Design a protein with these regions (language model features):
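N-terminal intrinsically disordered/low-complexity leader segments
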Residues: 1-5
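Helix-turn-helix
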Residues: 9, 13, 17-55, 59
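Residues in soluble alpha-helical coiled-coils and helical-bundle/repeat scaffolds
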Residues: 47-51, 55, 100, 117, ...
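Hydrophobic alpha-helical connector segments
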Residues: 55, 68-104, 157-162, 186
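Amphipathic alpha-helical packing segments from all-alpha helical-bundle domains
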Residues: 65, 70, 100-110, 120-146, ...
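Hydrophobic/aromatic-rich alpha-helical bundle segments in the mid-to-C-terminal region
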Residues: 123-127, 144-196
């Protein structure tokens, strides 16, 4: 039980440190201090800093995908007929460029992606979570397509685009006064998605 409790404390402490100082600033010593444990015990649980980051960042990404899955539960249900969940329904649930919440998530995602090249353990975990997100998004997109002959290739491309929105929002935030408005963005997506169904 103590072993399990210490692991949970370490994960909670690492999440706190990531929110405070980001991936680059995270120090195992600080995590140990906040978790009221030792660096050696952290290494016993996670092998090294890379292992700790892989576990914690992977968990955080999975938690966000859980929220995504809950948000689109109707579209993901096997009992929902294809086409009952419409493009309009999809647009109502998708994040918009100027959402502060999703801009923050985008920055977190960018930090995580930047760390992948030097952390094979993190890459392996984020590959799993990214593929999970893509599979869920692909099902949502397919269910929103009312075409008589759906194009599965289009579905895959749109699913990739939708699951990568947070990164688009970061770029939009950097445009300053030239930012794309939420209305422009939503109008374009509606026209784009509808054009794929003709």
């Amino acid at each position: 039980m103590e072993n399990s409790n210490s692991r949970e404390r370490i994960i909670a402490a690492a999440k706190h440190e990531l929110h405070e100082v980001g991936i680059l600033g995270l120090r195992v010593q600080d995590v140990a201090k906040r978790a009221n444990t030792s660096v050696s015990l952290i290494y016993k649980h996670f092998e090294d800093r890379d292992g700790l980051l892989a576990q914690v960042l992977g968990d955080m990404h999975d938690e966000r995908i859980d929220m995504w899955e809950q948000l689109f539960s109707h579209a993901l249900s096997d009992s929902t007929p294809r086409g009952e969940f419409t493009v309009e329904d999809l647009l109502l649930k998708l994040p918009t460029p100027n959402s502060i919440h999703f801009q923050t998530l985008g920055m977190d995602r960018a930090q995580t992606l930047a760390a992948l090249s030097n952390n094979p353990k993190l890459r392996a975990r984020i590959e799993q979570t990214t593929q999970r997100l893509f599979a869920l998004t692909l099902k949502v997109v397919a269910n929103a397509d009312k075409s008589a002959e759906p194009n599965t290739s289009n579905h895959r491309v749109v699913a990739l685009m939708v699951s990568s929105l947070n990164l688009i929002f970061i770029n939009n935030d950097l445009l300053g006064d030239h930012r794309i408005t939420d209305a422009e963005y939503t109008s374009f997506l509606k026209a784009f998605f509808n054009s794929l169904q003709k």
